[in-house]
Structure formats: C-alpha cells, structure tokens
UniProtKB/Swiss-Prot annotation:
UniProt pathway: Pigment biosynthesis
A single GO molecular function term of this UniProt record: oxidoreductase activity
EC number annotated for this UniProt entry: 1.-.-.-
Gene this protein is translated from: chyM
Top-rank lineage group of the source organism: Eukaryota
Phenotype upon loss of function: Impairs the production of N-pyruvoylanthranilamide ans downstream compounds and accumulates 2-(2-aminopropanamido)benzoic acid and 2-(2-((4-amino-1-carboxy-4-oxobutyl)amino)propanamido)benzoic acid.
Keywords: Oxidoreductase
Entry-linked InterPro entries: AsaB-like
Name under which the protein is recorded: Oxidoreductase chyM
Amino acid sequence: MGSITPSLHRGKFRYLTRGAKPAQSKEAYLLPPLSEFGDVLALPLVDMKPSLDLGDDSPYKLSVHGFTARRHHSALHAAPYERRSWNDEHLLREIYFPEVQELVQKVTGCKKVVVSAAVLRNELYTEGDPASATQTEQNGQDAVKKDMSELFPPIVGNSPTDGICPAPKVHLDLTPKGARYHIRKYHREVTSAAEQVIEAENRLLESGVQWDDLKDYYQGKESDDGVPRFALFSIWRPLKPVHRDPLALASCASFPESDYVPSEQLEPMDHQISAHLSRIIDPNAPKLSVENERQVQGGTCQTYGYLAYGPRDKEQKAHGWHFVSEQQPSDVLIIQLFDNEMEAHARAPQEGTNKMSNLGVGGAIHSAFELEGQDIDAEARESIEVRCAAFW
C-alpha cells in the first residue's frame, strides 16, 4: 500500500437539517432546493493529491472508501486539441469515452463498460437567490430531456445555454435499490449489458427474497450460483485548474448509518426495454405487475438516492471527507455510485460505536463544497463527469 502524509484542509458543506424529510423530486436528477439543506458545517478534509501517482498502491480503495484518484492524461489535452474540444460531442464520443472505458477496466478489472451519460459543468451555483439557483438546475434538467431523445449516451452541458452547475448538496445519486432500478429502466444498452444480473436477481425476487436482502446472495447460496457483479461509476475530471468549489468524497468506511437519508428521486426511463427485464417485482406478490414508481410525463420513473445529515462526532471527522487540492485536468476522481460486490460485505458503521449496522453500502456520498480560503471571485470551475456501468 502506498504511504502518504495526509494534509488537512477545511470546507463548508450543506446537509439536510437533521430530522427533516426531503421533498419528492419533480424532475429527473433534480435534488431538493437549497433551502432544505439548512445544516451548514465547516468540516475537515484530507488532501488526496499525494496518492495520484501511486496507481494500484493508492491507500484509497474503491472496495473500502468507495472512491480513488488517478493521474490520467487524455489525448484531448494535447495538440491539435484545445479547451473547446471538450465541448465537441464527436470528439467526446470518439476519443474520450473510449479512454474512460479503458481506465475503468484497468482500475477495476471489469470485462465490459457501458458509458451511460456525460455532464459538463461551467456555471456558478447562485446560492443567494433560491429561485435563480433552482432555475440553473432546471436548465440542466431540460438539457437532459433534450439529449435523452437523441444519441446515446446523452451529453449534457456542451451548449452554453445548458447552464449546468456544481451541486453544493451532500448526496449519493443511488441507493442499492436505486442502482437496481437504474439498470432495469434507464436505457436499453445498459439493461442489455446487465441482463445476466437482472435475471439472477429476478429469480431471487420471485422466490420471495426482498430487495434489501439481495446483498446476501451475491456469492450464491447452496446450489445457486449467485448474482453476477455490476457497478456504477462517475469519472470526474476538471477541464481547467480548480480554484473554487471543488468536489469532495466521503469515505464509506466511516459514514454512519444514522446519517444516510433515503430520498425518492426521478430518472429518465426507456420505454423500449423488454418488459421481462424492466419490470419491478414485488417479492410478496411476484406474479403481479408493479408500476408504482411514480411514472410521469416526460418519460421518467421513480428511483432512490441518498441525502445526508451532518456528522455529530466531537471532532466532526466521521464522514471522512477527501478531495484533491488545486486539482488539475489530469487529476481524475473515480467515484463509485454502487458496486454489488462491495454491498455484499461492507456495512455502514453504527454512530459512536465500533459496531457495524446491517445497512449495505456500495457507493460514496459526495458534494461540491466551499474550500476555506478559496478565491470567491474566481471563475466557475469547469468539469466533465462521465457515468458508466461496469460488468464482470
């Protein structure tokens, strides 16, 4: 394992007010308004920059922390390409997406990677005006709708009018159940790659196994071969040096069960997916067709993510926040949104004890944040996030 000396920083994070229940989302990918994130805390962070060149010897492990970081150069960084090349949809599809697929395969050892979406961000979050802030996010949702009907994977934010901004709200896009809904509902290319996973899980659900108990069958029991491995990742890269509002990642190893807040959310759905793969099975009535996912106009369906309450430990280190200081375009964050292999063995700790809960965890809570001492007059950070599904 690599040996590094952690450097501590502090930053401002926005959590749900403890005890508050988040409102249901009304648009795909739209988090609750900033007004619901009333618990604003200044918390310590560890700088991961010294780990970037350690490769597989990095102390930050996907299977433990839910994230890692790598130094990774893209062909789009060198001539004849320039900054605006990152807004060229053809170049992203022909050059960058294959680079991401290769990186994920190299880091995880998976056999297949399906790129499912890309998001470019280049706006400031207008915190002082909640209506304006919501509109900035809404522009992004409109862009999602527009792009989802065209080429796959959708690329959002490559037009100056899209107005996509960082999300200064502590969250994780998918719960384990949300991840399983995603591979069934989001797009036929993801679902096709996940067919063996879905069929294995559906056999268990039809036998009465509950959704939350699927984690116990990853390795299989008795004569069952178990559920094949799948994972969902976000590969996050700045497009210029980051001088404000960096992205932080919370460690799965220390984030307590009591601070995870399940939240109903909406996600685009593909109506062309075969019914036997897209259906949602009720283990208590497996022969009935369950369509209670809040299907609404615009081709969305209900899924589940996590928001969070702030830490209550005395030193306020329970959430184990990490980031890369002065992050450069070759400093890439690999964020695990879900991994069913990790979920099979990893449990969220119980707050204030050395014991583990029964909550299976498979992905890392994350958030944009205000770094203490950052230049508040600096230009908005610019980044590209590529989401992908991996299969073994």
